[in-house]
Amino acid sequence: MANSITADEIREQFSQAMSAMYQQEVPQYGTLLELVADVNLAVLENNPQLHEKMVNADELARLNVERHGAIRVGTAQELATLRRMFAIMGMYPVSYYDLSQAGVPVHSTAFRPIDDASLARNPFRVFTSLLRLELIENEILRQKAAEILRQRDIFTPRCRQLLEEYEQQGGFNETQAQEFVQEALETFRWHQSATVDEETYRALHNEHRLIADVVCFPGCHINHLTPRTLDIDRVQSMMPECGIEPKILIEGPPRREVPILLRQTSFKALEETVLFAGQKQGTHTARFGEIEQRGVALTPKGRQLYDDLLRNAGTGQDNLTHQMHLQETFRTFPDSEFLMRQQGLAWFRYRLTPSGEAHRQAIHPGDDPQPLIERGWVVAQPITYEDFLPVSAAGIFQSNLGNETQTRSHGNASREAFEQALGCPVLDEFQLYQEAEERSKRRCGLL
């Protein structure tokens, strides 16, 4: 359609609007943004080499706008409608996460951009969990939860109308896009009034706190919004100075010269006043703040090594002990870009330097990039990990549901049921990273 707005522009508008809304709802989130911005600035000022690398890799511009949100929905219909909503913003479901292995009765995916240009512009992602009613053991309670969920609609009538219009027209003009952002935002807004009485809330809460959070409110309120930092250890140590109490452990890999995957921490969930049906006042605890530090994406071989080491490491009682033990355990994981490339542990994006451009005819498909890197013709840039770690996600969920101890089991994965609810298969993160690396090699003449 003429004068249509791009998905990237809509995603940018939406992520900015959501950030502004969450800042109003959870003032500590604003404090967190300031702290992260200060730490990032200090890191870049003290490390000109990192600054230059991030500029060259198109990573710097996205740093200050980078966020991920997390939501939880109750029905297949809600999940499928969210898929249509996020598609308008150029966000697609990547990976399947089974959180039942940590005793959390949900399974999840991450809606995010998938092409290089969209990620460089604004890599906004939303970790989206679907409640698994079949994991509620009490049959009466399970039926009650299903009945409550059947009666709600988390989307405004106008939002549903706009979804139809977009799918019929194949796009939005500027006015429609702005209206869509405002209507979509309502789905994620916090509602103080619960849809159930206190007795029902307590019964669901006693079964699992997360079930009460999903079932008892009129929307799928955003339960955290996460900025990206370049030094999560520094942020963790400074949070108490800003009046923010961090969770005990930083989740994920240890601090390294070459960061890998994802490290996360958070502040404790807020106790918020709610009104139950019948105007009875009570409290609900679900929403919190989170910070993340992202590193290089790992190949299946690298991920296997990471998972094995993390399993062997276990968890410490406090963050200092935990991090020291992690560092000791992870000594066997190479900590240089060269070794990680050489051993096929991580994904990289290859670019020709001006000198490489001048010698393009001397570069052939199948050439080993390493001699070309040493000659100064090619640079290899780590591809940022854009996804999530199930164990870390579960750790964050548990600590903010009042439980710092991490219980892990084999879980009860049901990817097929999740994809059926979603209405499409989830994308394979490894395939996306491999394609990104191969695209870059092709541009250099290496493939």
From Swiss-Prot:
Site annotation Important for substrate specificity: residues: 72
Presence of keyword Oxidoreductase: yes
Keyword Glycosyltransferase on entry: no
Binding locations of Fe(2+): 68, 224, 290
Cofactor(s) named in the record: Fe(2+)
Molecular function, one GO term: dioxygenase activity
Keyword annotations of the record: Dioxygenase, Iron, Metal-binding, Oxidoreductase
Sequence positions that bind 2-oxoadipate: 68, 72, 224, 391
Enzyme Commission number, as recorded: 1.13.11.93
Top-level taxon: Bacteria
Record-linked InterPro entries: HGLS (IPR009770), YdcJ_bac-like (IPR047869)
Reactions the enzyme catalyzes: 2-oxoadipate + O2 = (R)-2-hydroxyglutarate + CO2
Pfam assignment, any one: HGLS
Gene3D superfamilies xref list: Uncharacterised protein PF07063, DUF1338
Purpose: Catalyzes the decarboxylation and hydroxylation of 2-oxoadipate (2OA) to form D-2-hydroxyglutarate (D-2-HGA).
Entry's family note: Belongs to the 2-oxoadipate dioxygenase/decarboxylase family.
Name the UniProt record assigns to this protein: 2-oxoadipate dioxygenase/decarboxylase
Source organism (scientific name): Escherichia coli (strain K12)
